[in-house]
Amino acid sequence: MAGQKIRIRLRAYDHEVIDSSARKIVDTVTRTGAKVAGPVPLPTEKNVFCVIRSPHKYKDSREHFEMRTHKRLIDILEPTPKTVDSLMRLDLPAGVDIEIKLP
């Protein structure tokens, strides 16, 4: 797999969970002998929802809810077959979305 790289993109609502998952991935990859670039924090996506508190009237009384999506990017340079195998066996929390690309 010489000359290739693997790009891993992580997304989660909780920043502590995503940081611990990124740390696990980096530790696993460095143990197999591949080079790692990252984790690079990408901009946090923030969705704000405005809801009227009353079911009938009082439109001036509103409540705001927000949902933040934290993102991290990890590049694995010069991966070995052992690296790919260890990444497939890695157990990460359910709240983390993982997207793996081979550009």
From Swiss-Prot:
Gene Ontology CC terms: ribonucleoprotein complex; ribosome
Top-level taxon: Bacteria
Pfam families assigned to the protein according to its UniProt record, in alphabetical order: Ribosomal_S10
Keyword Ribosomal protein: yes
Record key words, sorted: Ribonucleoprotein, Ribosomal protein
Entries under Gene3D superfamilies matching the protein: Ribosomal protein S10 domain
Biological processes per GO annotation: translation
PROSITE patterns: RIBOSOMAL_S10
Main function: Involved in the binding of tRNA to the ribosomes.
Family of this protein: Belongs to the universal ribosomal protein uS10 family.
Name of protein: Small ribosomal subunit protein uS10
Organism annotation: Cutibacterium acnes (strain DSM 16379 / KPA171202) (Propionibacterium acnes)
Organism phylogeny: Bacteria, Bacillati, Actinomycetota, Actinomycetes, Propionibacteriales
